[in-house]
């Protein structure tokens, strides 16, 4: 098993992508409570993310990237999760990497890659992918937004909901229906924000990840050149599968880093906080919660590491992806609640940031496919 990052003190950004965010901790963690309360995207902190080089990790050098592997990208995001207490900002960074850049590099034309990837890699062009619809949340294969061929263009009509980064995005990757019902009637298009017919709604107020904006996006007679299609017509399911595997691996590597930091903080508190003349960590009830947190962290690490290796080497990882997403998201919520309990009244206060962890964690059991959908998928793949 890969040792916990805390046991690798000599790691540097040059030797381990995990360390990319660490030099910027002070700037990333400034006034986190205030940004969360205002539910605003922290633009100055985004510039810090840009300077860190984290956004460049998985992209080819000819587009300004670092030519890192899938594992490198997971490590970079794990390190960001450990370093940055603004989980919403981290989530937007993960979305920036996977939403448009990853599928564009894998499936896009050279013309589109040369034109758009450099800005994506630097973070100057913020990206979002539009999959979820108001009437089709977890049922992504029944997308109803349509794209109709009209000469050299497609005309897109419909709408999407809960689109991360949409209020600030410059580029959108749209998953739409160009053919018959089912997975093989889907296609994917790259669309710029200022294209006539594309409307971005107001940011939606939400429980957690409050600095990561999301909104509705609607399309009315949105005319997109056929040259902006990513991959072949009807290849949308293939692209979606490629993206969703990486979305889960990347965003929950971020979560793993958050869990590592939470464990370290809880352990420090349990050793220093005294009640009845003893550190509270000596009480079995507290000690067992912390032991369970350590088990949860290492279980999450094992699932992410093994599943990432399968995806990176092209092995079938359908069950592994669903299990990883379920295990890590639910462990994150459980350990966040345990941290509140260990901190007691202090954990209930916004100033400590512990309650914010709970609000941020809950979303992980919903986005990228709910825990219930993941269990359904596992059962189906087992032949049930």
What are these regions (language model features)?
Residues 88-111, 137:
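N-terminal glycine-rich flavin-associated loop
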Residues 135-138, 162-165, 178-180, 206-213:
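Short Gly/Pro-enriched turn/cap motifs at secondary-structure boundaries
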Residues 145-148:
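A structural signal for short hydrophobic beta-strand segments in well-ordered beta-sheet cores
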Residues 215-242:
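A short, charged helix-loop
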